[in-house]
UniProtKB/Swiss-Prot annotation:
SUPFAM superfamilies reported for this sequence: P-loop containing nucleoside triphosphate hydrolases
Quaternary structure and partners: Interacts with dynactin subunit proteins, including DCTN4, DCTN5 and DCTN5.
Keywords: Developmental protein
Composition bias type Pro residues, residue spans: 18-32
Induction details: Up-regulated by USF1. Up-regulated by FOXO1.
The name this protein goes by in its record: NEDD4-binding protein 2-like 1
Organism: Bos taurus (Bovine)
InterPro entries documented for this protein: NEDD4-bd_p2 (IPR026302), P-loop_NTPase (IPR027417)
Described function: Might play a role in adipocyte differentiation and triglyceride accumulation.
Amino acid sequence: MEESFLESFGRLSLRQQQPPPPRPPAPPPLRGTPPRRHSFRKHLYLLRGLPGSGKTTLARQLQHDFPRALIFSTDDFFFREDGAYEFNPDFLEEAHEWNQKRARKAMRNGISPIIIDNTNLHAWEMKPYAVMVFQTEQKNLFRLEMDMVVFRPEMKKHSWSPKRENTPNERTV
């Protein structure tokens, strides 16, 4: 599953994508070979990055690649019934608690993978989800730093960053 997840990064693009070519059927197992065991490990992905860095785009790509995946975003709290987004900072704490309850319920129900699509800029935003991993049957926690994954050329003229050395986990896009 981890390899497929990493492949999702490679398919991210701002351009319209062509459908992938069909995969050839798997060859039948050799006689006497035990059947391949499927991984039943549960996964929680914490997407982390500034607004506009591509977290929601990646979350949707992952959900496309893994149809059983559920996305939980605190932003959903601020959508009105008519579909309009209306952020109110006075309700931010309540919105985070609401999202955590939804994620906890999904974990307890054995849903996997679970994708947390929040900015998660502060440790207090991520900590409840990390704690849930140890309180439930989730086995793997992945924190993805979006500022190292998504390059958006149209945003380049509005951004500035200091010169820095490449870090071992950084992916140049």
